[in-house]
């Protein structure tokens, strides 16, 4: 019994052990299957690599065969004959080449001389046009008449007769008005005449006044003149004493006595301007126009003074040495501009070249000038005979005078020096004026003398202004020369509307916009772009009409709208509205009228310099950098998808986001579209794309801008793609000969097959080629608009600060000083 039971138990335990063994066996088989699968995958990878290696070896073998074929020598007999023939013809070819080089050099020199001549003529024409554009002198020259010679309607026959007699008594060396007109056409004489006067001004007595004037260091008091006041027997040369009739009328008619001065005294705060083309050097015969009435009032306090220039008559008897020291001989006509303010008892006379000096009013008593004897009213510069006060200076001359005055860098400094050297008996006072107070105050014109104190030597102001004018001409800023080319490096203008989030409207576009079907701005695989106008605002826009045939097409349009809703940059086109219909979708976008960048490249009339390409490329990189910051890939960058804002500027906007995609780092994106000429190698190989894909296209565009050629263009699309896959390109020797190494380095670091080796948009913006634009502009002899605007801003700030200083000082003078 016990034996049978044990046997039965042994047989029952065997099935349990078998099941455990089978389970273990299954696990091992599964593990073996997994390992076999891994081996198979590894084998496939190895096979692919071997196949690619075989293909590379095949390419290498074909290349070696081509190289051997190109180096293989020809038949022995014919080769020797050909070498002898070619060697015999070499000297003749060299001589012809040398002759051609000499002829080309001669022609180049001639063309360069002709170009310089044409440039000089252009600058001269521009200068003459700018000078006479708003001047009445042009009318005088064209009409052949001299209006200031005409008698005033208010002049009596007796006065006209006296004027004719006085004009007949002039010396022969006095210039006529016609001579003044002819000399006004030669601006080159101005600097010579100013230099002559600058050499003689050192022998003149100094100007002693409370206002601004010439530099005190430039004038030396001559011996024998106490305190710079001429004696009773001294007078300036070439001056006639005031007529007796004028002396008799002076105390009776003060308004007529004002006519004896260089300028008519207008209302307080008004400015009197003398045209730069109508004033001449000192002459003789000046006392004839002293007592003429003034029937015609001045407009804005301006007047022309032709004929002999302002003279300073005084008592007769000046010796010949003083005469030579004052006039320096017969001086030809001189062009100048005067601004005079008559708001205070001591009038300030201002020249347009930075010279300021006081003039004496007619109501100053003669007792204030001890040691000086003469008729009343002789303390001011007198007006030449035949001068008409009714003639007006053009508005441009008044603006030119103020501009030239403000361009003098030593104006404020000279004012402070002159104040320090003022006489103890004089005290500056604030001139009261209405609207012109701020303008004139900035130039330091609001100074006068206290009543009862005269100007000891007002006549010296006429000659002391000449060297200051000549110095101001030499101080012309370097930005004022004509003929220098200015490049607009300013950023692209923003869209004429605020950035908005656009949603598709299922209405007709004609409800709110007027589309010009006949005016096509562009087109492509998507459809056409027409110009349109918003009916409510009249805003010019562009309507991109996209044909849709399937649901996928509509999804692509919505993807483009979603991407453009995220873009708000000046170098990226902005979306304004969107409409959807049964067969099409319409995107209303910002409108620019400069045309495609591709047209700039292909236009033979438009020559792109390297600096132009730098400006274009920098803006392209800025737009691409903004896209990549928002994780957007354009994937269709090409010159046709870059628009210029205008026909001549360098501002661009990137368009056409139909192929753009949102980049997600965890997702692998593959695309198989785009223009073959600008595709990156990873797109051709249908591999994963990323930000470097756009940078490859930027490199191709830069290459085309620099050379006008395409680096990978083949005869067919297949050949083009083969060049791209092999990254087969080089710098064309002819087109890249004169370009900088920085430009070549920029392109070389973008057209790299390995994506990780290409520069990013941030690195491109930091590249040396796209930076330091002022130095590049200086080397290419051009100027940047940003530099001009910066200089203008700095000058405005400087003069504004000076204006505040002068205004504050003038306000402080209002407070009475303690006794």
Swiss-Prot record:
CDD domains: STKc_MLCK3. Its EC number is 2.7.11.18. Phosphorylated on serine residues. Residues 515-770 form the Protein kinase domain. It is found in: Cytoplasm. Keywords: ATP-binding, Cytoplasm, Kinase, Magnesium, Nucleotide-binding, Phosphoprotein, Serine/threonine-protein kinase, Transferase. Its cofactor is Mg(2+). The modification Phosphoserine is found at residues 152, 355, 401, 408. Residues 146-460 are annotated as: Disordered. Disulfide bonds: none annotated. Signal peptide: none annotated. One of its GO terms (molecular function) is myosin light chain kinase activity. ATP binds at residues 521-529, 544. It catalyses: L-seryl-[myosin light chain] + ATP = O-phospho-L-seryl-[myosin light chain] + ADP + H(+); L-threonyl-[myosin light chain] + ATP = O-phospho-L-threonyl-[myosin light chain] + ADP + H(+). GO terms for biological process: intracellular signal transduction; positive regulation of apoptotic process. Residues 307-318 have a biased composition (Pro residues). It is an enzyme of class 2 (transferase). The keyword Kinase applies. Kinase that phosphorylates MYL2 in vitro. Promotes sarcomere formation in cardiomyocytes and increases cardiomyocyte contractility. Belongs to the protein kinase superfamily. CAMK Ser/Thr protein kinase family. This is Myosin light chain kinase 3. The lineage of its organism: Eukaryota, Metazoa, Chordata, Craniata, Vertebrata.
């Amino acid at each position: 019994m016990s034996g049978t039971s044990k046997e039965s138990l042994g047989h029952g335990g065997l099935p349990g052990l078998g099941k455990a063994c089978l389970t273990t066996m299954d696990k091992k088989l599964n593990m073996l299957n997994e390992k076999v699968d891994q081996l198979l995958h590894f084998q496939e990878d190895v096979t692919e690599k071997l196949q690619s290696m075989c293909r590379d070896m095949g390419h290498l073998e074909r290349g070696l065969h081509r190289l051997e074929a190109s180096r293989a020598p020809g038949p022995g007999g014919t080769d020797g004959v050909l070498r002898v023939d070619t060697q015999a013809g070499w000297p003749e070819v060299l001589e012809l080449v040398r002759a051609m080089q000499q002829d080309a050099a001669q022609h180049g020199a001639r063309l360069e001389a002709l170009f310089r001549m044409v440039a000089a003529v252009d600058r001269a024409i521009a200068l003459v046009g700018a000078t006479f554009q708003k001047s009445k002198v042009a009318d005088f020259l064209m009409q052949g008449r001299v209006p200031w010679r005409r008698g005033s309607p208010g002049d009596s026959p007796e006065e006209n007769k006296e004027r004719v007699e006085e004009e007949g008594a002039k010396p022969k060396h006095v210039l006529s008005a016609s001579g003044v007109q002819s000399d006004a056409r030669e601006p080159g004489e101005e600097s010579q005449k100013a230099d002559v006067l600058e050499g003689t001004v050192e022998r003149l007595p100094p100007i002693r006044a409370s206002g601004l004037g010439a530099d005190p260091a430039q004038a030396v008091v001559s011996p024998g003149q106490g305190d710079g006041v001429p004696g009773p027997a001294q007078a300036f040369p070439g001056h006639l004493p005031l007529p007796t009739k004028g002396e008799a009328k002076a105390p009776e008619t003060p308004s007529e006595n004002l006519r004896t001065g260089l300028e008519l005294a207008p209302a307080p705060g008004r400015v009197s301007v003398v045209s730069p083309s109508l004033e001449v050097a000192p002459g003789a015969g000046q006392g004839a126009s002293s007592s003429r009435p003034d029937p015609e009032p001045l407009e804005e306090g301006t007047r022309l003074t032709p004929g002999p220039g302002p003279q300073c008559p005084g008592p007769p008897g000046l010796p010949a040495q003083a005469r030579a020291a004052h006039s320096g001989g017969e001086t030809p006509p001189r062009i100048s501009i005067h601004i005079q303010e008559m708001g205070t008892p001591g009038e300030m006379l201002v020249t347009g070249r930075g010279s300021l000096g006081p003039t004496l009013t007619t109501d100053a008593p003669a007792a204030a000038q001890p040691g000086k004897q003469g008729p009343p009213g002789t303390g001011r510069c007198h007006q030449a005979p035949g001068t008409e006060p009714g003639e007006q200076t053009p508005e441009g001359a008044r603006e030119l005078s103020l501009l030239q005055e403000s361009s003098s860098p030593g104006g404020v400094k000279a004012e402070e020096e002159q104040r320090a050297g003022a006489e103890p008996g004089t005290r500056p006072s604030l001139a009261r004026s209405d609207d012109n107070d701020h303008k004139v105050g900035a130039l330091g014109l609001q100074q006068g003398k206290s009543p009862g104190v005269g100007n000891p030597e007002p006549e010296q102001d006429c000659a002391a202004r000449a060297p200051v004018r000549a110095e101001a001409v030499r101080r012309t800023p370097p930005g004022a020369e004509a003929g220098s080319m200015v490049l607009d490096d300013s950023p692209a203008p923003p869209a004429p509307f605020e950035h908005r989030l656009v949603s598709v409207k299922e209405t007709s576009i004609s409800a709110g916009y007027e589309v010009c079907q006949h005016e096509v701005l562009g087109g492509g695989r998507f459809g056409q772009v027409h110009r349109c106008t918003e009916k409510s605002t009249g805003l010019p826009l562009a309507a991109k009409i996209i044909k849709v045939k399937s649901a996928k097409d509509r999804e692509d349009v919505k993807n483009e709208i979603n991407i453009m809703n995220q873009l708000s940059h000046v170098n990226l086109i902005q979306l304004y509205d969107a409409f959807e219909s049964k067969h099409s979708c319409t995107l209303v976008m910002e409108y620019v009228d400069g045309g495609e960048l591709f047209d700039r490249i292909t236009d033979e009339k438009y020559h792109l310099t390297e600096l132009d390409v730098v400006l274009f490329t920098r803006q392209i990189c800025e737009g691409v950098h903004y896209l990549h910051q928002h994780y957007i890939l354009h994937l269709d960058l090409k010159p046709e998808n870059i628009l210029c804002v205008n026909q001549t500027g360098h501002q661009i906007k990137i368009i056409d986001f139909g192929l753009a995609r949102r980049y997600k780092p965890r997702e692998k994106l593959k695309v198989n579209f785009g223009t073959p000429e600008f595709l990156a190698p990873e797109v051709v190989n249908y591999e994963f794309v990323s930000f470097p894909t756009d940078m490859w296209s930027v490199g191709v565009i830069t290459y085309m801008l620099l050379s006008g050629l395409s680096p990978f263009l083949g005869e067919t699309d297949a050949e083009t793609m083969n060049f791209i896959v092999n990254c087969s390109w080089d710098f064309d020797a002819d087109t890249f000969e004169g370009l900088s190494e920085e430009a070549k380095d920029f392109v070389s670091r973008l057209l790299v097959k390995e994506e990780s080796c290409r520069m990013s948009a941030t690195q491109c913006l930091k590249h040396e080629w796209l930076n330091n634009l002022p130095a590049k502009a200086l080397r290419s002899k051009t100027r940047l608009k940003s530099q001009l605007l910066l200089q203008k801003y700095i000058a405005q700030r400087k003069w504004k600060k000076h204006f505040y200083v002068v205004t504050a000082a003038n306000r402080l003078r209002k407070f009475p000083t303690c006794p």
